[in-house]
């Protein structure tokens, strides 16, 4: 279509009015500036996913009336954002002669002693059920402290409460970032094994990675893959971006020997654990593919032995304290793990336990009663995992790292996971998250993850999001948010529709960014938002205003076939040469992405065309590196022989940027050529199962990693 806006006739239609009323986009402009209007059947389906009936004309009008009436008659919004240091106005509804009375209970349980002023509202009077509703405003004072508070408002004998999220205006940069920058490494934790590993990298390996990278290279952070909770027994989803829960962490990374209980095992039990470890030690030398399931089956046997040995009085008290701190939320994951353990993986059928039963089902209660020890075992595993991850971050800070762990937050969760099964009301029903068509994915993308329901978020004070962010900052110095545009809008795809047949649903980004600012400030941490691709100007502006860094990837910093000089990159970003969706630098320079896509049948056109495009990109990058003085032109005479020099030039370019954070990839530093993840594949390629190896295919063990000559050369460049 040539128009870029909806006409008045379309805007007046009830289905369009209803969609806009609840934040559903009825049109959008694509990446190529192409304009699209959303079909009615898509809007009806997305409204249904929000719990709103739009099945016919009468239902649409009734839904509009119901929603508007609810908004007009509620005294206060369920969730209110307050910016610390500024006055905030809260809209209050009541009768013309009613005088609102308000009080605030602070997060710590005390009463706010300051004065809450009342300010007159608009002259607009709304007639509702034969009465009249007027609007006035409560003014929350600038000195209201940060935190999650409870606002209680009484009007005309009726009382309502609202969650007040009192957050800093922005996240302040760390002192070392204000005038300069910090650099660190990025890696996939599971891929880096030591002699003490059980087949994949674990939390003890992470501790060593952090401490050794600071000690031997001067790095100040380690960006790692998401550590969200996974399945408790095989089959285990390999992608860390499709977790069972984002509230809890992955206990398959536990190192049994690092637990205090291991040290006091009986000789017989200790011998059993050691023998189990010996069984999987050969996995550490496999350079081809990681075997998570064999690793976990074996490690789990060892953990059962340790669990059954019991806890000392002090350790039991620490476990009890953990359970008290996490509250009832631990029951969601532990119960789901028990069900998965005993009833198996979801198969999607109507008889599937995930569909058939819910948290209150009698069958679930019976299973919990039948296996109390297994239920406690899963609670215990989560506690142990949390302890070991926390110990890794603590060791990083004690070693002198300014940040330590940069945790990665996935976009969403598995549709059959514990978050969705335990609290389905928090999620949209009958829709998944994805992306509209673009130049790389002409049919759009469906990520198979149910979106959070923005209406439920508002009604519950965004508690699920608050808890998740708080949990991540408990064990990290920074959080990277995958697809941060999702805090502003998400592409919803109705069940049964193609990925292209969806629309955007908007979220209250100010509140979600406020939560990030509050949790990051409390932790003295940093937030990085993955904002690659085309980002609306208002999103970039909002992220910047909140002190959230974006992402700059050297291979993506191009326009019209020319690469942007690193000195011209935006400063408020985490810069890297590549991402986990691309081959490492050596593989990319050797056109590994072309070869792999051809091999897997992922090319939409002739391989010659893709190769030609890749060569043009390749040559443009090398030209930029030469023009900017990062690479001597003589290196181009034999690129393969001078590959290390070219990779060094890529990193000299990275170091030449003004970006506040810079990350070097460990895979680049050891010469690895294989990509960790090939988008558009599942079983065709071993995504998220590639162990760390050098360019010759030899395993690089953690014990030798920081003595690697190439790694030290790249570290020297990053230190400047």
Residues covered by each model-derived region:
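Amphipathic, non-membrane alpha-helical segments in soluble helical-bundle scaffolds
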Residues: 12, 407, 506-510
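Acidic/aromatic-lined carbohydrate-recognition and catalytic surfaces
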Residues: 49-110, 114-115, 123-148, 153, ...
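Secondary-structure transition/capping motifs at alpha-helix termini
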Residues: 157, 215-216, 394-404, 473-479, ...
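Carbohydrate-interacting/catalytic domains
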Residues: 1-224, 262-267, 521-522, 526, ...
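Alpha-amylase-like alpha-glycosidases and glucanotransferases acting on alpha-linked glucans and related
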Residues: 109, 233-386, 412-661, 667-668, ...
């Amino acid at each position: 279509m040539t128009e870029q806006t909806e006409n008045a006739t379309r805007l007046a239609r009830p289905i369009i009015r209803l969609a806009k009323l609840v934040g559903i986009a009825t049109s959008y402009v694509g990446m190529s500036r192409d304009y699209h209007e959303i079909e009615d059947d898509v809007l009806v389906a997305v409204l249904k996913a929000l719990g709103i009936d739009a099945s016919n004309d009468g239902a649409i009008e009734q839904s509009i009336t119901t929603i508007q009436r609810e908004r007009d008659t509620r005294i206060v919004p369920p969730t209110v954002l307050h910016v610390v240091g500024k006055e905030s106005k809260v809209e209050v509804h009541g009768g013309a002669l009613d005088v609102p009375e308000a009080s605030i209970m602070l997060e710590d349980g005390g009463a706010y002693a300051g004065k809450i002023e009342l300010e007159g509202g608009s002259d607009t009077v709304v007639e509702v059920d034969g009465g009249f509703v007027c609007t006035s405003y409560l003014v929350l004072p600038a000195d209201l402290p940060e935190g999650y508070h409870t606002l209680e408002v009484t009007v005309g004998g009726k009382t309502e409460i609202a969650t007040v999220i009192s957050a800093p205006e922005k996240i302040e940069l760390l002192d070392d970032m204000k005038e300069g920058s910090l650099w660190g490494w990025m890696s996939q934790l599971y891929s880096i094994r030591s002699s003490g590993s059980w087949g994949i990298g674990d939390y003890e390996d992470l501790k060593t990675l952090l401490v050794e990278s600071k000690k031997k290279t001067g790095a100040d952070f380690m960006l790692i893959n998401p550590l969200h909770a996974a399945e408790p027994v095989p089959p285990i989803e390999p992608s860390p971006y499709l977790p069972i829960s984002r509230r809890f962490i992955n206990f398959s990374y536990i190192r049994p020997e690092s637990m205090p209980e291991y040290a006091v095992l009986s000789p017989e039990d200790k011998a059993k654990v050691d023998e189990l470890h010996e069984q999987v030690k050969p996995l550490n030398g496999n350079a081809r593919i990681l075997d998570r399931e064999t690793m976990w089956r074996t490690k789990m046997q060892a953990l059962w032995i340790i669990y059954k040995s019991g806890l000392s009085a002090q350790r039991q008290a620490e476990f009890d304290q953990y359970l008290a701190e996490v509250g009832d939320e631990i029951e969601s994951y532990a119960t789901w793990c028990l069900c998965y353990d005993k009833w198996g993986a979801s198969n999607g059928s109507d008889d599937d336990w995930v569909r058939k039963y819910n948290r209150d089902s009698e069958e679930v209660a019976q299973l919990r009663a039948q296996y109390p020890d297994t239920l406690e075992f899963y609670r215990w595993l989560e506690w142990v995992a949390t302890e070991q991850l926390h110990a890794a971050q603590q060791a990083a800070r004690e070693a002198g790292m300014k940040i330590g762990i940069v945790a990665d937050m996935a976009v969403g969760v598995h549709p059959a996971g514990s978050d969705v099964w335990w609290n389905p009301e928090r999620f949209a029903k009958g829709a998944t998250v994805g992306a509209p068509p673009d130049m790389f994915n002409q049919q759009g993308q469906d990520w198979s993850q149910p979106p959070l329901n923005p209406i439920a978020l508002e009604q519950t004070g965004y508690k699920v999001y608050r808890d998740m962010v708080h949990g991540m900052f408990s064990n990290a110095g920074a959080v990277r948010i995958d697809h941060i545009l999702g805090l502003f809008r998400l592409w919803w795809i109705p069940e049964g529709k193609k990925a292209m047949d969806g629309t955007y649903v908007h979220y209250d980004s100010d509140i979600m960014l406020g939560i990030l600012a509050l949790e990051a400030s409390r932790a003295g941490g940093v937030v990085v938002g993955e904002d690659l691709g085309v980002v609306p100007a208002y999103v970039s502006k909002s992220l910047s205003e909140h002190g959230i860094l974006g992402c700059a990837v050297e291979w993506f910093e191009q326009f019209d076939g020319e690469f942007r000089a690193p000195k011209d990159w935006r400063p408020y970003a985490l810069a890297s040469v590549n991402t986990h969706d691309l081959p490492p630098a050596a593989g990319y320079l050797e056109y590994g992405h072309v070869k792999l896509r051809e091999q897997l049948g992922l090319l939409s056109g002739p391989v010659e065309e893709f190769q030609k495009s890749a060569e043009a990109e390749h040559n443009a990058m090398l030209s930029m590196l030469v023009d900017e003085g990062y690479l001597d032109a003589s290196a181009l005479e034999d690129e393969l022989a001078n590959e290390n020099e070219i990779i060094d030039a890529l990193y000299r370019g990275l170091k030449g940027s003004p970006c506040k954070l810079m990350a070097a990839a460990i895979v680049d530093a050891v010469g690895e050529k294989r990509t960790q993840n090939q988008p558009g594949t599942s079983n065709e390629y071993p995504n998220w199962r590639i162990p760390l190896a050098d360019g010759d295919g030899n395993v690089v063990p953690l014990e030798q990693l920081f003595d690697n000559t190439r790694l030290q050369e790249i570290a020297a460049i990053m230190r400047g």
